[in-house]
């Protein structure tokens, strides 16, 4: 199976999201799948203002669309809601492609702590982003309950391969 994973979180960041995606791609390859990752590498980026280790891709739409089209995946997984994730979601929506997504961290709380943007606004964005997904993978029961509370649709745990 050809599996495409799109993520805004990648090396040189060192965090749980990056480690999880790196290990997931390795395990999928061990099972014989062809795995490609779309990461900020190869895109024009700027550092995230409140977290400079995060590289935000600038204007990734056309390149992401081309990469998805060229790879022609059997499975599209969008792991983050940043510029690359948004570009992949847009391509999938415009072209009728199903995709799965993931919610890794308490993003709205993180945004609120740094900007005081009300949680309701960030959760509204997440609801819009993930409700088009066939399946939203979450790391824990606690995170699942949080997202259900904010009406983010049907969720399923990520599972170790």
Regions found by a protein language model. Name each.
Residues 1-43, 71:
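N-terminal subdomain of nucleotide-sugar transferases
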Residues 124-161:
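Donor nucleotide-sugar binding/catalytic pocket of nucleotide-sugar-dependent glycosyltransferases
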Residues 98-100, 107-128:
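Nucleotide-sugar donor phosphate/pyrophosphate-binding loop at the beta->alpha transition
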Residues 84-87, 144:
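Short, well-ordered alpha-helical microsegments
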Residues 50-67:
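Glycine-rich, highly charged phosphate/nucleotide-binding loops
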Residues 64-85, 95-100:
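Short N-terminal targeting/anchoring amphipathic segment
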